[in-house]
Amino acid sequence: MLNIVIFGAPGSGKGTQSERIVEKFGINHISTGDVLRAEIKKGTELGKTAKGYIDQGQLLPDELIIDILASTLDSFKESKGVIFDGFPRTIAQAEALKKMLAERGQEVSVMLDLDVPEEELMTRLIKRGQESGRADDNEETIKKRLVVYHSQTAPLIDWYKNEGKYQHIHGLGTMDAIFADIVAAVEKL
């Protein structure tokens, strides 16, 4: 079972590389962002609650995310593994993921950290916002998201290093070059 956590700041290429990993290794993809955006679009209670946090550039409460994740994970019957995109974002979530997988006789295989300089992240996100119309890709919200990332999410790097699961991926360069580094890291497992 190949369970990958793909990690990096907003705009680091997690979604793009996740799609390629899914195709290459035949695993399922759980993007908490995509799941939440679908709930928002449907106008569900969960979606309305999530929208309030997202519009403010805030992280959602752990219980909310973990419930969504457990339900999505259990919907995959015959699976070679999962790539977790956008989760975990806090140490508490990483511990909850470890417990949730252990209850299913699984574990995280590797945490891939897509490392991209902040100036490049800003450029990518502003461009993405202009092209996609995503409300959370405006300059003010981007800056808030990066502050939240550095204060709440970045400590996960040390947590996964201590777990022996951390793999640094240089996130600048062509999509193909970055993907080649990812494949090399995964195939070493």
Curated annotation (Swiss-Prot):
Pathway of this protein? Purine metabolism; AMP biosynthesis via salvage pathway; AMP from ADP: step 1/1
Cellular location(s): Cytoplasm
Under the heading SUPFAM superfamilies, the entry gives: P-loop containing nucleoside triphosphate hydrolases
Region named NMP: 31-60
User: What are the binding positions for ATP in this chain?
Assistant: G11, S12, G13, K14, G15, T16, R128, G173
Q: What is its main location?
A: cytoplasm
Q: How does it assemble?
A: Monomer.
Comment on protein domains: Consists of three domains, a large central CORE domain and two small peripheral domains, NMPbind and LID, which undergo movements during catalysis. The LID domain closes over the site of phosphoryl transfer upon ATP binding. Assembling and dissambling the active center during each catalytic cycle provides an effective means to prevent ATP hydrolysis.
Name this polypeptide is given: Adenylate kinase
